[in-house]
Every structure is written in structure tokens, then in C-alpha cells.
Amino acid sequence: MTSPKPIRTRFAPSPTGFLHLGGARTALFSWAFARHHKGVFVLRIEDTDVERSTDAAVQAILDSMDWLGMQPDEGPFYQMKRLDRYSEVLQSMLAAGTAYHCYSSPEEVEAMREAARARGDKPRYDGTWRPEPGKTLPAIPEGRKPVIRFKNPQDGVTAWDDMVKGPVSFDNNELDDLIIARPDGTPTYNFCVVVDDWDMGMTHVIRGDDHVNNTPRQINILKALGADVPQYGHVPMILGPDGQKLSKRHGAVNVMEYDDQGYLPEAMVNYLARLGWSHGDAELFSREEFVRWFDTHHLSKSPSQWDPKKLNWVNAHYIKAMDNAELAQRVAPRIAKRGGDASRADLADIMGLFKDRAETLEQLADDAMLFCAPFQAAPQELATQHLTPAAREALAGFAAAAAGTEWTREAISALIKAQLAERGLKMPQLAIPLRVAVTGRAQTPAVDAVLVLLGKDVVLERLKALL
């Protein structure tokens, strides 16, 4: 009895731009499927569009994959390094009669399509150069370089059981004889994909449903080569909050922009996973749980809707749950970028003070500057509003009593309560002036916690300077 064939999946982006959210989600599903089945996840860079492909886009794809924790088991492989292999397969297909040279000019092909439209038929190449038994082909036009077309079956049906959509079928007579090599000999996208999937032993292909129309053509080429046909799954697109196709007008679509904006990769993986896949009513789960639970049966057949508020909620959960020391390591570079002191020994404590109300690391870094940036006194308007003569008198009393007080949250809280009772004040009448006096802000976390982290000497020094 032979052992089952190991699962092999792939992600095959074109480096003509940065990795967008839809591509990242497709990669995530392919990666999780391979991990779930203890298979192999392959990264392939489809860079045959030489004019539009850039090294910067390749690096952005690699950086995005690394940030999301989707390291490939094999690759990256580059199509431009496989041109000799494509040429070899093209020649074998010409020799086998499954491909042929076509000398029709683009203008002639367009005329064929127009004629088909006029007849009410589907616009297509009419097979002028398609060799058939007993058929006489036209004379080869002088000086014209041919394309190579695949000799697609003209009858029957090409069908597959899609892992997401279910049964899908196309009548072969609806499929054109696809161009698989251009006049200069360079192979086309659909041909390269087929050869790559064949050579790399792909067993399952999960990709966007914009590829559905390519699939019957690719299946027929694979069959002509005598290759195994992978199982295909086509996931619906991601829509913006307005129900339109997700685009830049909805905000960031480049994955690494979310890193810049302070989203955790763990949160992004969680959110992307739930965008078109579900496991019961579970909203929050670890990467390990996602891999353990993932299966294609629970991929949605309907488009998903991008919800920035939901992403913020997920990110806030991961920030709250993260160890303060780990959080400090992740936020430190953002503090340094703002010119703050990211080397403070109490940075983890600062994270603990702010993280329960932070939705992003950027917000957390902004909050942390309260302690990590040089002190700036309150703006005049804020000082006028809150540092009244009565408030200054209360602050002077607090400062005098604080000089001999142990500097803990409990002791400071008790001191504030004692001052309130002694002066007949309510909490805001002392707490807000204290905040404004020692932080320059009217709103901060709990005032006793802020005072502890600032340190007794700093607090008394700032009060002395004010009074």
C-alpha cells in the first residue's frame, strides 16, 4: 500500500507592487493548509512581467511574509530563472502536436473577434492556424514571428470540484486556443504557472476567485502534458466597508503599512484568518489554534468585508494580553523614532499603565512619551483653566505632605484622599491640577500610578517650579 502523497501548496505573487491584503489572506490560507496537513508551503515569485516587476516589490513581499510569520518551506523560486525550462516544455508540446505556431497578426485576431460578436458568438480566435488532419494551413507571412498557441480540446467539458465553490465546469468549446508564448519566445503567465505547478508537485492550489477563468485552461494544459492536476480552491475577494472592492480609498491595502501603523502581526493573522474562514463562533485564537483548526470546508463562498473597527478591536485584545516586557521591546523603536528615551528601565511598567486603552502600538508610543520625552509645561490655556490660585494652594499642601511620604501607589492614594478630606475638595479638584502640573496634560491614567512612575524627585521638582 502506497503512502498518501504529501500536501504541497504555494503562494505565487507577481512583484509588480506591494503585497496587498487580499494576497496576504490567500497566502495565509495556503500556508495554514500546508501546516495543518504537515505538508510543504512554497513561495514562487511570478516575475515574467519584466517591465512592471521590481526588486523593491520582491523585497516588500518577502518582508510582509516574514512579518506575518509565514516563512516558506521552499523558495522563493523566480520564474525568470526558469526560462530554459519553459522553452523545453514548449518545444515538447510543439513536437507532440498539443501546441502550434500561429501567424495571425493582432489586427487579424481582433477582426476575428469582431466578426464573432457580430454573429452573436463569444469573441475568440477562429483557429486559422490550428492544424487538423486534412487541413491546409495558409502560407506563412514573410517576416512575421508567430505566437505559440495551446491546442485546446474543442469538445467535452473541463470540470473540477472546487475546495471553496464546489463543482465548477466549463464547456471546452467556450475556451480559446490560449497563447502560451509571445512572438519573442517569452512564455505567458498561464503557461508558466502550469509548468511551475507541475515541476513543483503542487497538490493543492488556493487562490483568489479572479483566477477561476484561468483554471480550465491550466487544467487542459496539465492534462496535455500528462501531469497530475492539483485540487483548486478559489476564495472570494475582500470588499471595503462600503461593499465595493477593497482599494486605497478605503485606507491602507499594503500589508507593511499596518506594521507602520502599529498593528501586531499576531492580530493581523487572526483578523485575516476570520475574514472568509470560521471555526464556530471563535473570534480570537492563536496562530497554533488557527493551524490546528483550519480546513477548506469552512472557507466562505461569499465576499468578506473589511472592517477597520473590528481590526482595532482584535489588535487591542492582543496588546492587552501581551507581556509588558515583550510589549516594551516592540514599542521601544517607535519611542526612539519620536526622539524619546526608549532605554528607560521602567518601560515595561509604562506599557502596563497604558496598554488597557491602546488600540495600536503607535498609540502606545504616543502615550509613553509622557514619561520618555523631555517635560513640557502645560499650554497657557490649560494652565489658566486648571492651575487656579485655589488649585495652586492645594498643590502646595500636597507637595509639603508628599516630601515625607513613601512613594508607592497605595501611599500616594492615601495622601491624596487625606488632602481632599482636609480641604473639603472632590477628587477632580486635586487630581486634575496634579496631572496638569506634573505632566502638562489634563488626561492621563490613574494619577497615583503616573506619580509613581515619574518618581518622587521629579514630581516635587515640577511642583516646586510651578509654585
UniProtKB/Swiss-Prot annotation:
Main location group: cytoplasm
CDD domains: GluRS_core
Composition skew (Basic and acidic residues), residue ranges: 118-133
Region annotation Disordered: where it falls in the sequence: 118-141
UniProt keyword annotations, A-Z: Aminoacyl-tRNA synthetase, ATP-binding, Cytoplasm, Ligase, Nucleotide-binding, Protein biosynthesis
Reaction catalysed by this enzyme: tRNA(Glu) + L-glutamate + ATP = L-glutamyl-tRNA(Glu) + AMP + diphosphate
Protein localization: Cytoplasm
Residues that hold ATP according to the record: 248
GO biological process: glutamyl-tRNA aminoacylation
Protein biosynthesis is among the record's keywords: yes
PROSITE patterns in the record: AA_TRNA_LIGASE_I
Record motif 'KMSKS' region, residues: 245-249
Disulfide bonds: none
Short motif 'HIGH' region, span: 13-23
Residues forming coiled coils: none
Protein EC: 6.1.1.17
Pfam short name (any one): Anticodon_2
GO molecular function: ATP binding; glutamate-tRNA ligase activity; tRNA binding; zinc ion binding
Catalytic class of the enzyme: ligase
GO cellular component: cytosol
Entry similarity comment: Belongs to the class-I aminoacyl-tRNA synthetase family. Glutamate--tRNA ligase type 1 subfamily.
Subunit structure: Monomer.
Function: Catalyzes the attachment of glutamate to tRNA(Glu) in a two-step reaction: glutamate is first activated by ATP to form Glu-AMP and then transferred to the acceptor end of tRNA(Glu).
Entry protein name: Glutamate--tRNA ligase
Organism of provenance: Bordetella avium (strain 197N)
Gene: gltX
